[in-house]
Amino acid sequence: MISVTKPRIVVVNDTDVNGYHFRCARVMSIIRNQLSIRGLDIVGSVAVSLNWQDANAKLVNSADILVINGEGTLHHGSRKGRWLLEAAQSVKGRGRSVALINALWQNNPADWGDLIRDVDILCCRDSRSVSAMVEATGRDVRFIGDLSMSQPVPQVPSTRSGVVIGDSVHANVTAALAKLATKSNEFELVPVTSSLKFLSPNLTGLRRKLRTAYATMKQKRFLAQNPSARFLANEDEYLSMVSKKSLSITGRFHAVCLAIATQTPFVAVTSNSWKIEALIEDIGLNTERMTTLTDLANTDLSEGRWDYSADELANIEACLTDWHSAANTLFDDIAALA
């Protein structure tokens, strides 16, 4: 009997670190599941924020197919973004295959295009990034909305009530949103993360213990100062919660994606790149859903004010259907690289 050796699939920028970010956990779960049902299993991954060249060079260079989860890393020439592109170059230099998927691409150095010009599959999560990457590489680049929205969620309830207020990558926005949550009994403060502080996989030993103690102290203080706040354990709990709300107010792209996936109306405060604005443009939603922290203080946030229009709902449903189909094609094509 002839044995068939499976190709070695390696992922870099694995953003599911202990389930901390619910949307990130969902993206990585979708990547794993979609590869698995096509007979491809991930043999190893490099966590977000880690330089693969430090301790994972052997793993990355053993890949037959390297999957780079671009996420929000590839903007403004970030050092961590360059690490991902250098991984692509290393694997392509060995004659193996690389797929860069689910990527933001914004305001990057001119030479970055050279680093991915030979990558087998290029796929961005917003049309602005597609245009920028096409200009940088001269290549065809696919567009699929964030992978967190590419697979169906549990059935959405027919009735909704209450307002969920989230957090932001910016501490001042998180603080302002927490203050906003005290303005009404209808408001509940629920971040889209399992805890207040992220524990980087870079931290080990004494540094990790100290960071853990600090994070625990900060979270206890946050909960004491914000009686309406609670942290959920996982993605399923968050999806169940947000799908029952009449409005989500957030400063995170993560929470906007999950609001759209569950057809929950939202208002968003601008983040650290164009990702939320681009998502609103791509779907065709009311641009007034995007606001600044200053304007949010004067915004009518009453239930029903931000319900989706018939056109918005139709646009969401059309995009989710298209992205589901396009994601299936994407993973079929990744499997075909084997």
Question: Whereabouts are the PLM-identified features?
Answer:
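Active-site anion-handling motifs in enzyme catalytic cores
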Residues: 1-338
